[in-house]
């Protein structure tokens, strides 16, 4: 019978953590100061915004047109349903 991957007899190399990477007693890492954490947060925001694929002007125009057209259709649909339900309520309740 073969041993399963990561069994106790043969530990994986990735399970070993170098001494410099180990956490302190209790499993918590040292806290950074509030300004350091804020700077890291903003750095991460900038890094994520650089990954965004922004639309071209033509794409933006076409997407905006589609959204406005769809919203206009939905407004008309809700208006027709409201008008119909209003007349149905007047018919039922007098």
UniProtKB/Swiss-Prot annotation:
One of its GO terms (cellular component) is plasma membrane. Residues 22-32 have a biased composition (Basic residues). GO terms for biological process: intracellular protein transmembrane transport; protein secretion; protein targeting; protein transport by the Sec complex. It is found in: Cell membrane. Disulfide bonds: none annotated. It is a single-pass membrane protein. GO terms for molecular function: protein transmembrane transporter activity. The chain crosses the membrane at residues 59-81. The keyword Oxidoreductase does not apply. Keywords: Cell membrane, Membrane, Protein transport, Translocation, Transmembrane, Transmembrane helix, Transport. Pfam families: SecE (PF00584). Residues 1-32 are annotated as: Disordered. Its main location: membrane. InterPro entries: SecE_bac (IPR005807), SecE_sf (IPR038379), Translocase_SecE/Sec61-g (IPR001901). Essential subunit of the Sec protein translocation channel SecYEG. Clamps together the 2 halves of SecY. May contact the channel plug during translocation. Component of the Sec protein translocase complex. Heterotrimer consisting of SecY, SecE and SecG subunits. The heterotrimers can form oligomers, although 1 heterotrimer is thought to be able to translocate proteins. Interacts with the ribosome. Interacts with SecDF, and other proteins may be involved. Interacts with SecA. Belongs to the SecE/SEC61-gamma family. PANTHER family: PROTEIN TRANSLOCASE SUBUNIT SECE (PTHR33910:SF1). This is Protein translocase subunit SecE. The gene is secE.
């Amino acid at each position: 019978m073969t041993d399963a991957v990561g069994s106790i007899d043969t530990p994986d190399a990735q399970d070993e953590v170098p001494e410099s990477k180990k956490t302190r007693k209790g499993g918590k890492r040292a806290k950074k100061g509030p300004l350091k954490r804020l700077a890291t947060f903003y750095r991460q925001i900038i890094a994520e915004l650089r990954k965004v694929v922004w639309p071209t002007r033509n794409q933006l125009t076409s997407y905006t047109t589609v959204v406005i057209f769809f919203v206009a259709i939905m407004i008309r649909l809700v208006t027709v349903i409201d008008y119909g339900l209003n007349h149905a309520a007047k018919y039922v309740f007098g």
